Each structure stands twice: as C-alpha cells, then as structure tokens.
Design a protein with these regions (language model features):
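Metal-dependent nucleic-acid phosphoesterase active-site entry motif
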Residues: 1-21
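Active-site neighborhoods of divalent-metal-dependent phosphate/nucleic-acid chemistry enzymes
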Residues: 72-118
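Phosphate- and divalent-cation-binding pockets in alpha/beta enzyme and binding domains
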Residues: 46-47, 82, 104, 125
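Acidic, PIN/NYN-like endoribonuclease modules and their adjacent C-terminal/linker elements
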Residues: 1-3, 102-103, 107-137
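Short, flexible helix/strand-to-coil boundary loops that buttress conserved ligand/catalytic motifs
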Residues: 15, 51, 127
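PIN/NYN-family metal-dependent endoribonuclease catalytic core
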Residues: 6, 24-54, 74-75
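Helix-adjacent hinge/juxtasegments
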Residues: 52-76
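Alpha-helix capping/helix-boundary segments
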Residues: 10, 43, 79, 100-101, ...
Length: 137
C-alpha cells in the first residue's frame, strides 16, 4: 500500500464543486482508494475551518476518512520550530503549513511514497530529492 501525503488544497477542491480544481481532484481520488493517507495536523486545521464544517455532508465524509484504518494523522510538533524559522526567513515565500509539509517530506523516518497537491512548485525539489511521486496538475 502506498503512503500518500495530501495537501489541503486537494481536500478543498475534492469537496467543493465550485473549486477550479474540483474535476482534477475527483480524477486524483483514484490514488486514495488503496493508499495509506497521511494527514499532517496542520492540513486538518486548514481544512476543518468554519466554512467547511457548515457542510454536514463534507464534514461527515472527512470524519470517515480521518478515522479510517488506512489513515495516519501526523503530529507536527517535531517540525514546528524549524518550520517557523523557515517561514520568517527572508526570501522564503512558503506558508507555515507548506514548510511543515516540506519538512515531513524530507524526514526519512516517515514513509511517504507520494504527494497530492495543486501547488507543485513549493514541493517539487524535496519530492525529487526523496524520490516521492508528485501527483499534481
């Protein structure tokens, strides 16, 4: 079973028919069928915002997914200090969540086979170094 880390943008698109990437997210959904899905906690903080939780259908589907036996939620505390430093570093235009994801992708103690994102430019380098499949538009 492949381990896939999935970025917040994918989940927004997957659950929102009006999102510009919705059709692509549905297409990428096949990757999730037989995968171990990795949820960094920061992506859950982004996804489960006020607007999202108002949709009981989307919230219910996300709850099932998060609680599924093939899902792993990853605590970010190990990465937070370094990610904060990177975020405030001059010339780094990546969000705190993206920096945490980058550090997780770079962590060889985590088995990550692929990353699903619609923001490939922020992750392509670390994915290439670690030989992680980048599933992106």
């Amino acid at each position: 079973m492949n381990s896939l880390l999935v970025d917040s943008g994918f989940w927004y698109a997957f659950h929102s028919p009006r999102d510009q990437y919705h059709e692509k997210a549905i297409e990428y959904g096949v990757y999730l069928e037989n995968a171990c899905i990795i949820f960094p906690y920061p992506t859950l903080y982004e996804i489960l915002n006020t607007a999202f939780v108002k949709s009981k259908t989307s919230l219910g589907r996300m709850e099932e997914l998060v609680n599924a036996p093939n899902t792993r939620c990853i605590n970010d505390s190990k990465y937070l200090t370094s990610a904060m430093k990177l975020t405030f570093e001059k010339g780094n235009n990546k969000s705190l969540v993206d920096n945490i994801i980058r550090l997780m992708l770079d962590d060889d103690t985590l088995r990550i086979d692929g990353l699903i994102t619609f923001n490939a430019r922020d992750f392509y380098d670390v994915c290439a170094i670690r030989n992680i499949e980048l599933i992106s538009d």
